[in-house]
Amino acid sequence: MALFVTSLNSGSNGNCYYIGNGTDAVLIDVGISCRETEKRMMQLGLSIKTVKAIFVSHEHTDHIKGVSTLANKYKLPVYITDATAKQGPGLIRHLSQAFKAEVPVTIGELLVTAFVKEHDAADP
């Protein structure tokens, strides 16, 4: 099955990346509004119904701005490290799932493995 990866937005005004296989998808960061995320996905012919989870790379606003709204609206689990969750302003706790770098997470037919990166954040 083919894997589709695209940037819905990138830069200091917000980061959001879609990774999917036609059946299952995840978003990496939602640093743009829920409405803008939905709009950009629709423009690309991507269904929000395939999104099964959100992964948060770190707590900076340009990576988390729309996470809570989108996760609440679609009841999506949010995979986030404990350190990032503690630093992220206004991140929802009831949909949060803790994860760690180098420990794979299975989302449908996708296997997501995070890795540590140097950055000025709690746990990038």
Where does each model-flagged region fall?
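Conserved beta-strand hairpin/beta-sheet module of binuclear metal-dependent hydrolase folds
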Residues: 1-44
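Metallo-beta-lactamase
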Residues: 80-124
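Active-site metal-binding motif and surrounding structural segment of the metallo-beta-lactamase
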Residues: 34-83
